[in-house]
Amino acid sequence: MKLKVSIGCDAQHTQIAWVNYEGRPTEVDGPLWVGRILVRVRDFDGFTPDGSPPKRDSEYFRGRSRKFQIQAEGRFKKEYNGDQVIYGTQFDHMISTFPESAFRAGMRIAKYIDPAVYYDKYARSPYIMSPFVACVNTLSAWPAPSRLEDAVISLVEADSQESDTESLPEINDSSDVSLSDLPSTNVTPKKTTTQIDVQTNIVTPPITVTAVPDSPNPPAATPATVADNDDLSIVSSDSGNTTAPRKNRHRYWSFAGFSDSTRFSHLNVPAAIPDAPSVKTETSQNVSQLSVKSAATSLAPVEDDEDDELLLHRHITNKHKDFNLHVKQLGLLHKPSLDLEEGYIMDENYGKDVYKHGISNVPDDENEDDLQRYFTALEMQQDQKEQHKKSKNKDPFRKITHPSLHLGKFSTPKLIKRMSLRSKKSLRNDSKSDDVGNSTHRFSTASAASTSAVKTEKEKKMSAPRRSLDKLIRIGSLHRHHHHHHKTDLIESDSGIEASESNRRKSDIFSFSGRNSFSVSRPSSSHSTLSYANDSASSAVNVAGETGSLPPLREQTSITSGVPPSNRLKKHVSTPEKIVEERSIDEVSQSNTPSSKQLPQSVDGKTVTANANSTTVAKQPTSNVALTRPKPVRTATSQSKIPKPVKHIPSDSNNLDPQLGPWRFANPKVDPIEDNSFIFGEHKSVKERRKYFSSSKFCRENFFYDKDVVYCMSFFSPHMDFNTFNLNIGPIRLNVYKHLNSDGHQPIRYMMRETDDEDAVMFVVEFDLLEDDDETVLAEQAKERERRKQT
């Protein structure tokens, strides 16, 4: 027997679906809903619309435990609130032979996952249903093509969406769930005023209504019994059933609503109003009051020349220069590890080299956990080689304690404890103390020596017996951060002193009188000293953390001795032909004080500054125009914050493009994402969304579906294998096919319909097992082949 998957606007009007073909979703245009539906089935070996060989699998299932997925996007043709649309399974008749204990156990598990689920055995068509807005695994939205220019979007950063499954509750035969367990589902007609304000309510956060908690507390995470093993990507578009928390966070473009809503009235206010009087906007049930002045300052729209990093959690409209590019990425999650050359936008010169090495996202040091920063070059190379290898038993600290390091017989916790040198707080305190010491060195050599003595005494107290390991980790971490985060800032004038990155590496590096040298303090006798060329008027740059903001030039090593820092010299080799002596930071600081003996002279267009201990030569422009620092170039650090536009693949299903826009998921590397900012005004997890809409009928009735919005959902499960109809959920392991057909043949039918009318159906997806030579299927396949020949 083979699996037949059919899709239609109701049970009487269906067609065979192209299973696992991302570029061929089934188009549905009924009286209540218009949209596209895509079905994926693992190890599919069933019927195709034209009788061609089936596509057995999809990239979607790689690294996941899911057995099937239903993905639907579309628009409602009527006005509904959140309580008037339900989704679930509906049968043709009652299943009399299904074990009662198994049914009760299954319903308890279903209610544990989705608290709003309910069933009715004795209805004309028995069903197991739940409110659509509460039960789907992911929910997102974007504006219809006719309202695209009115959209308000924002770049959102959120935790990784979680795994497929979670630990299941204990099962006993006395457990049962019915309609009586839930609040009444009778729909109260909407008032006239509510019907008028449908558009406003759809984009405003209903959680601010009286007696509704503003931010529901997510339940505590529980260990998963079935691991997801999603090794494909940095992030996953899974359901939100929490397992172990993941380190990484992802960024995506989110749809917040329409600009004509009172919620976004501040976006139409001029950007600069210095002394505007406090004028309050029109208020509604779900909109807070904002003054014009506060809206113009803290919530003003982003300007065209504003840095990309400022886009995070900021609302932008069609006035933004890249709006048309970003609005096409709404609701999409790209899995960059499936294609190492696709990930995030970076600088034009930097990005190509970074992508070749398979690094698509550089983490932010300030948001990164301390233990995640202890990487070495050896670990990085080894991880790149093994990133596609599957491992059954992964060490969660494998990036920190890589087996190839051969660090000894230390246990993982003990080794991590030894490697975690100091906390961020102590590092910041040390940085502040270094700043004070540097300022003291500027005025007195004696005070510099005193500060050095105190610093040496402090290092003795904090030193650890792992100096070689510290240096290995430190140098690897600095090199990794330096290579991917920094570009050299050029000092140029109007006369045209210009230099590229490649030319600078080849040219001689001259020493400026205002050069700053920096010594990174570590609890070890070995120090890493970095120096860089900078404007003499610039202030000293402080290293604030393990991989803080560092200059992009040379790195040298000096050994601490009993000689005061002011008497030590360091040598820099710029080229094989030229060797320039440079002083330490103490002497450079002293040279800038009034007591320093500096004799500036002009020789052939160059400035020569003579001191007692060193001579420094610096190029000087021929013009009298003052040197100015150019505007910083956006490097990989800032550009990596913006998700790269997903590669669009044209779809064969384009008849509904005028109503829905182009199909966005023909690329198998793209998944629908959980994006509910249009509901709550900010990102909430799947569990928080489910908990909120399952908590009361009042919450569902205060959410409205907008006819100008395309809603996208995905529904999946790792428990049901439709190729065999084997159900495996918790203690339940049985084949449901024989029970379904004991009293007459019937398929498993998922549908979205109205709550009060079982005949008011938006769409259906049927799964059925049929014989290979089923006449109905053969006739439908022949009809499809004939249609394709004509077109």
From Swiss-Prot:
Subcellular locations according to the entry: Cell membrane
Annotated stretches, region: Disordered = 158-189, 381-505, 542-606, 630-658
According to its UniProt record, where is this protein mainly located? membrane
Could you say what a knockout of this gene produces? Reduces the amount of phosphatidylinositol 4-phosphate 5-kinase its3 at the cell membrane. Leads to sliding of the contractile ring away from the midpoint of the cell, and consequently off-center septation.
- Any one Pfam family match given in the protein's UniProt record, by short name: Duc1_FFAT_like
- Basic residues bias: where? 415-426, 477-487
Membrane topology term reads:
Peripheral membrane protein
Q: How does it assemble?
A: Interacts (via FFAT-motif) with scs2 (via MSP domain); the interaction is direct and serves to restrict the localization of duc1 to areas of cell membrane-endoplasmic reticulum contact sites, and away from the cell division site.
Q: Which family does it belong to?
A: Belongs to the UPF0590 family.
* Protein name as annotated: DUF1769 family protein duc1
Question: Which classification does the entry list for the species?
Answer: Eukaryota, Fungi, Dikarya, Ascomycota, Taphrinomycotina
State the encoding gene: duc1
